[in-house]
Amino acid sequence: MCGFLVWLYSLSMLPPMVVALFYKEKSLFVFFITFVIFFCIGGGAWYTTKKSGIQLRTRDGFIIIVMFWILFSVISAFPLWIDSELNLTFIDALFEGVSGITTTGATVIDDVSSLPRAYLYYRSQLNFIGGLGVIVLAVAVLPLLGIGGTKLYQSEMPGPFKDDKLTPRLADTSRTLWITYSLLGIACIVCYRLAGMPLFDAICHGISTVSLGGFSTHSESIGYFNNYLVELVAGSFSLLSAFNFTLWYIVISRKTIKPLIRDIELRFFLLIALGVIIVTSFQVWHIGMYDLHGSFIHSFFLASSMLTDNGLATQDYASWPTHTIVFLLLSSFFGGCIGSTCGGIKSLRFLILFKQSKHEINQLSHPRALLSVNVGGKIVTDRVMRSVWSFFFLYTLFTVFFILVLNGMGYDFLTSFATVAACINNMGLGFGATASSFGVLNDIAKCLMCIAMILGRLEIYPVIILFSGFFWRS
């Protein structure tokens, strides 16, 4: 299996090769070398182990999930590292690779606009591949080869209700999710093009927007285009991509939008999104940065981008009031819906925590009443409640830990907070010293933020469980 997935991932070097060939860029050779190396390594390993017939256990699923996200990050960094014209150290290339494949969108490259077009496309492609998860794509293919992947899929799908199955045929479900994801990307590309964005930029931004990755073809990000329609498209597709993709699957399979209307998590998420947009609009309008129309457009885009952990930005977001940026950074912890390409804690968990808090208040008011926590008409079990509280505690603990470590390295508190929020939430937008580039971080800080990005993307548990002594017992 390991060899097959490496071999499969090596094929992702072919599209950048086509782009480099079309634009007659020297990076063609770099991508070709990367393709050949990992095609041979992966193919050789697959050929020697494909008849082993080893059955995966739950423990193996967790190990493989973490191992492959690390492995794919290293492979993603390889072409960036070996190209001498980019002048990136291995740590810088690794940071860029991890940021791309985890859909974080943070970059150490100061002048993105100067990159060859093959690399601009490649970075957006990393976002797209990482968006729904390399494992989801693998699970759609592996069953056809007679390799069981159910345990991997259960480990990858986030959320307290992740054990629920969509259909009896996992491969069909995964394939439908991938097709839905691709169609959303195509729709975004078309809308960007209609809004006036050049075709190449539209393709790159389209696939990075629906993945909520945030890599751009310009150093100024979306602000480069100075176009209200482009910002509306980016904000709208950021919100759409924050929907639970299970809902998109049900909508397609049942040919009805009722699941979107009835889903309590989605309604809660949209309510929070509306509140964040309104508050942000009022703040920037109140201080006179823009007129009322401009305040709404810019706030709709940036609030949607940061709330959903997309990370695309307007050119002058760093000049916004500090309290507004801090408010948006805090909103990035909220994230979107469970089962989406968002980072963050996710809206369903916050909804459960809110319901639990309300339940405790009611219980204190009526000590003898037999009350329960209900979400969408269903009673939340103690097991789910423990899972949500445990996740919230661990997420907060790691966030505080990383902030204190960066602050101890000499970075000011705002820079430390913004950097950690950008990485662990897979949001990608820094502030303070990292507003324009994360290249200002030292190598140790970059490595720590790589860990934060992977922790955020895998939602902590698959990583930390590997350090549990109980996990390794027979």
Please tell me what each predicted stretch does.
Residues 1-474:
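Membrane-proximal intracellular helices of multi-pass ion channels
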